């Protein structure tokens, strides 16, 4: 036997790779703790917490037509934006082999919907076009990326039967799109749920969606009305599969157009050129004073960009690790193999509430309880994303519960959790965690609108002061940071080989 073959080093095991990834996440979070602004202020939350609990247990809303209108406008923004973004994303996905298209899609999806809303508000005021574009633009980039990855996963054999002279568009029409159609439609339904959450939180910047009334109720201390709004939104998310069916789209789309709110304030699309050519550039640049421009950029970077960027990244890393902890603790509550029939449905309901409630709303609640620091943001991000990933992991566990892999002598309870279910689910759990890393970073940045010292705080302040040059640079820095994290996440997934077999089909199980 050839000794050189025997001398070859053994490839690293899956357990070793996963252990290394977990160690990296743990070290990054621990190193972030001393520098992150997560101090607990001296507050007495128990009285406020009891009032919130009473509001959730006894929801009340006197103006039912206003509640229905708010829900309808939330759905209208989400539905119309997805109806436009999905075909646009599909078109870009067919051109995704071009570097310029990939860069464009990465840049538009790296900016949060609320930041897009603040930008378009300067052009179109508090009108329907602002809300639609705020969701449509980043969602188009997301659809393009995901649809392109779905196409890459399709088997190549059907395409080989076509004539070599057939153009690329026909190849997509005759092979790739029909092959990928179930995954494309399933992911589109999943993005619609995400669009509902995005539409709701657009109310935090003044649009008349659910978030506007929710923020007002919380600020006024009317927790019974806030509870009614939260429960209404949870029911809306939970019943999507009943009222959002393909055959009903011809009814919902015209109704959504009719439900859009009227224009409030100005709407000046002709201002776009001045906004792009003048307003977003600092005065020294417009005057050709390059020395003054350098001084302006250095000052802004040292006083706003760097502090905001550091806090955004630190909170992201802590929230990422805590998300993994929440997932590991929560998925057994909804797993048929671990929870049993009595605990499973309450567990699934808990995860439904966590994944349905936007991070912004959870952070707003925690701010009232713990004061203005990064702690509310970390808790909100971990609970929402942990609830979402736990739901996915529990669904994967349920799918295998009656499979041939199960044996009559398999252990139960804690032993099954530790030795069977968690080892089997852990690679997919990490893969979903890395998929959400980019999202957690975007949400960490936007938490600044609530007063937390992330990049969003400085962006919101710049818009309030009508300093569009500062806001533009800060948004660019946010996008660059987001693209960098997305690149690191993608490379880690590939290096550790922890891609789930069918990530997009699995993700859509949140709709079921």
Can you name each region flagged by the protein language model?
Residues 30-40, 118-125, 135, 190-193, ...:
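A structural signal for multi-pass alpha-helical bundles of membrane permease subunits
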């Amino acid at each position: 036997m050839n000794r050189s073959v025997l001398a070859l080093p053994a490839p690293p095991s899956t357990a070793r790779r996963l252990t290394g990834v977990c160690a990296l996440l743990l070290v990054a979070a621990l190193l972030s703790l001393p520098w992150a602004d997560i101090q607990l202020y001296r507050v007495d939350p128990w009285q406020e917490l009891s009032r919130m609990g009473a509001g959730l247990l006894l929801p009340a809303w006197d103006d039912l037509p206003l509640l229905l209108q708010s829900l309808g406008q939330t759905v209208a923004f989400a539905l119309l934006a997805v109806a436009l973004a999905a075909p646009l994303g599909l078109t870009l996905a067919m051109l995704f082999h071009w570097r310029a298209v990939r860069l464009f899609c990465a840049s538009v999806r790296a900016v949060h919907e609320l930041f897009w809303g603040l930008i378009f508000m300067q052009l179109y005021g508090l009108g329907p076009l602002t809300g639609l574009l705020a969701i449509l633009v980043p969602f188009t980039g997301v659809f393009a990326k995901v649809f392109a990855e779905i196409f890459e996963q399709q088997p190549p054999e059907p395409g080989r039967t076509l004539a070599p002279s057939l153009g690329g568009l026909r190849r997509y029409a005759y092979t790739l799109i029909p092959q990928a159609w179930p995954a494309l439609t399933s992911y589109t339904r999943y993005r619609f749920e995400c669009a509902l959450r995005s539409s709701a939180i657009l109310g935090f910047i003044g649009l008349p969606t659910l978030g506007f009334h929710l923020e007002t109720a919380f600020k006024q201390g009317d927790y019974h009305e806030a509870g009614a709004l939260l429960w209404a939104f949870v029911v809306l998310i939970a019943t999507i599969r009943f009222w959002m069916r393909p055959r009903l789209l011809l009814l919902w789309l015209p109704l959504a157009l009719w439900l859009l709110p009227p224009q409030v304030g100005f709407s000046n699309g002709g201002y776009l050129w001045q906004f792009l050519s003048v307003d977003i550039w600092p005065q020294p640049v417009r005057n050709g004073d390059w020395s003054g421009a350098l001084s302006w950029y250095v000052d802004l970077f040292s006083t706003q960009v760097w502090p905001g960027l550091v806090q955004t990244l630190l909170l992201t890393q802590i929230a990422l690790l805590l998300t993994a902890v929440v997932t590991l603790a929560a998925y057994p509550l909804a797993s048929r193999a671990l929870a049993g029939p009595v605990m499973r449905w309450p567990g699934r309901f808990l995860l439904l509430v966590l994944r349905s409630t936007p991070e912004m709303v959870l952070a707003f609640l925690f701010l009232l309880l713990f004061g203005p620091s990064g702690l509310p943001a970390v808790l909100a991000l971990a609970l929402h994303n942990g609830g979402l990933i736990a739901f996915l992991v529990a669904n994967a566990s349920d799918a295998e519960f009656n499979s041939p892999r199960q044996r009559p002598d398999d252990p139960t309870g804690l032993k099954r959790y530790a030795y069977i279910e968690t080892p089997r689910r852990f690679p997919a759990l990490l893969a979903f965690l890395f998929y959400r890393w980019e999202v957690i970073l975007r949400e960490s940045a936007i938490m600044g609108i609530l007063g937390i010292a992330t990049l969003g705080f400085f962006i919101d302040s710049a818009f309030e002061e009508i300093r569009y040059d500062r806001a533009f640079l800060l948004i660019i820095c946010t996008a660059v940071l987001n693209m960098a994290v997305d690149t690191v996440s993608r490379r880690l997934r590939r290096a550790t080989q922890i891609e789930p077999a069918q990530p997009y089909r699995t993700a859509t199980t949140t709709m079921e």
